[in-house]
């Protein structure tokens, strides 16, 4: 407990620095551990007084961004246990890392409120089990024969879910990574083994297959999950009673230390991911779904590959999102522009950090030109746009052909319409020509909405929806009046 208190009291934050850091970060918590070993793109950034270290969150935020490594008891189902947790902690949402059968015990990661966004990633993570198997008869080869059979059942295996399972009984392929025999008693027909496997593996089916291999038949007697994803039973495992007592202590004694001990920050599930540290000024843009670009990058881990899942984090060690890397470590070290990662699952709340986009010199110049009417409302060039802007400004968000077309386009709408009319008069009407006209209309429509911001798109869609609803109301009113007249 003394260690956790000390960790909460200390200030764990990446500070702006001119040279290499001399601080040892081996004992720093969660995502900041060994951050000094990360590769540095730049040490310069402006810290923003927003957000805080995961261990220093106020209790409400700590619980709503927390996970519990629960020791599931035997008999209740996983869904029942999670529902009880929701009621005990008075949370809005809870989720778990993968179903355990009612009789199975062990690690069940319960995610609370904001942390439920990580449920999908944890359900697909690897699992480890310890199983007690009961054979239906003695085997002549004894322990050696059992070991051989266990080794045979490694790698990719065909499995069909047991009858007891509440899922469709389809044949599926699951991988057994490793297995070890702990104990075997041929006289009592019992064996205990450990297995590391892919998510969705049925150990009950594995036991039946072992029995078939040994030629005597077998079934699963008992099962315990000892690891689920990033958490194992040595990593702060708590019981339902611990959670109930911790909540009672807070309600009656106002002592939150027990709740902080049973609940861990959601960042503890992401320690196995490769890290990318984001500048404070870029955090809120990523929360709104923006891709992380090179200027917003501070540090990154070695060995990142393209399309690999990474965790985007703040300088205070908070997880922002799970992203898909768009550049490898080598490219990140050498490039000065481009997309670093795109967001797969956003974790952090929006507007926890202030908005900082649109405040650069180019963005401010663009705003001035838009307000002066020298750019259209979507920021695209028109006939009044200065030649210097057309040549120097590069729009990275727009497709190259579209921006080139927009820059070179000087024909008035009337001329285009006149040209189209002339072509229609000259050419005989055919299905092909109609299709061409339709394509032209679609292209025009697409270009008209190109380059608009998320807020402008949302506003346009809202107006369109209101117009549609108004039209439907008018239509239904007209139909009602017509029916009244006919009566």
Curated annotation (Swiss-Prot):
Reaction(s) this enzyme catalyzes, per UniProt: uridine in 5S rRNA = pseudouridine in 5S rRNA; uridine in snRNA = pseudouridine in snRNA; a uridine in mRNA = a pseudouridine in mRNA
Biased composition (Basic residues): 460-477
Principal localisation: nucleus
InterPro entries (UniProt xref): Dyskerin-like, PsdUridine_synth_cat_dom_sf, PsdUridine_synth_N, PUA, PUA-like_sf, PUA_sf, tRNA_PsdUridine_synth_B_fam, TruB_C
Biased composition (Low complexity): 400-410
CC annotations in GO: box H/ACA snoRNP complex; microtubule
Domain PUA: 273-348
Protein name: H/ACA ribonucleoprotein complex subunit cbf5
Organism this protein belongs to: Aspergillus fumigatus (strain ATCC MYA-4609 / CBS 101355 / FGSC A1100 / Af293) (Neosartorya fumigata)
């Amino acid at each position: 407990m003394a260690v956790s208190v000390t960790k909460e009291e200390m200030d764990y934050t990446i500070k702006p620095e001119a040279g290499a850091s001399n601080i040892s970060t081996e004992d720093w918590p969660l995502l900041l551990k060994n951050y000094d070993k990360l590769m540095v793109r730049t040490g310069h950034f402006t810290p923003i007084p927003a957000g805080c270290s995961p261990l220093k969150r106020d209790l409400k935020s700590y619980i709503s961004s927390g996970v519990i490594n629960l020791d599931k008891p035997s008999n209740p189902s996983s869904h029942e246990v999670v529902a009880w947790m929701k009621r005990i902690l008075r949370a809005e949402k809870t989720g778990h890392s993968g179903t355990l059968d009612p009789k199975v015990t062990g690690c069940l990661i319960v995610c609370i409120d904001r942390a439920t966004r990580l449920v999908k990633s944890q359900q697909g993570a690897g699992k480890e089990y310890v199983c007690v198997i009961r054979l239906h008869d003695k085997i002549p080869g004894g322990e050696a024969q059992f070991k051989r059979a266990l080794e045979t059942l490694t790698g990719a295996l065909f499995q069909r879910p047991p009858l007891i399972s509440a899922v469709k009984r389809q044949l599926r392929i699951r991988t057994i990574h490793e297995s070890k025999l702990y104990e075997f008693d041929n006289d009592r027909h019992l064996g205990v083994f450990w297995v590391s496997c892919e998510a969705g593996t049925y150990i009950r089916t594995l036991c039946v297959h072992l029995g078939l291999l040994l030629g005597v038949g077998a079934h699963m007697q008992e099962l315990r999950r000892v690891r689920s994803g990033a958490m194992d039973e040595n990593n702060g495992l708590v019981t339902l009673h611990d959670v109930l007592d911790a909540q009672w202590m807070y309600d009656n004694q106002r002592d939150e230390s027990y709740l902080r001990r049973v609940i861990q920050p959601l960042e503890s599930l992401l320690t196995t991911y490769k890290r990318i540290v984001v500048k404070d000024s870029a955090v809120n843009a990523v929360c709104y779904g923006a891709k992380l670009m090179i200027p917003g990058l501070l540090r990154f881990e070695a060995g990142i590959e393209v399309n690999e899942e990474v965790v985007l984090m703040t300088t205070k060690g908070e997880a922002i999102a799970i992203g898909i890397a768009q550049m490898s470590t080598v490219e990140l070290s050498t490039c000065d522009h481009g997309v670093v990662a795109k967001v797969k699952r956003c974790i952090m709340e929006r507007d926890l950090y202030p908005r900082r986009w649109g405040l650069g010199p180019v963005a401010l110049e663009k705003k001035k030109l838009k307000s002066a009417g020298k750019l259209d409302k979507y920021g695209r060039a028109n006939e009044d746009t200065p030649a210097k802007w057309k040549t120097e400004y590069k729009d990275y968000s727009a497709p190259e052909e579209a921006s080139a077309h927009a820059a070179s386009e000087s024909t008035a709408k009337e001329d285009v319409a006149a040209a189209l009319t002339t072509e229609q008069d000259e050419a005989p009407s055919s299905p092909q020509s109609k299709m061409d006209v339709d394509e032209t209309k679609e292209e025009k429509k697409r270009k008209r909405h190109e380059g608009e911001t998320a807020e402008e798109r949302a506003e346009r869609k809202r107006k369109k929806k209101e117009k549609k609803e108004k039209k439907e109301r008018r239509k239904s009113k007209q139909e009602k009046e017509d029916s009244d007249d006919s009566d």
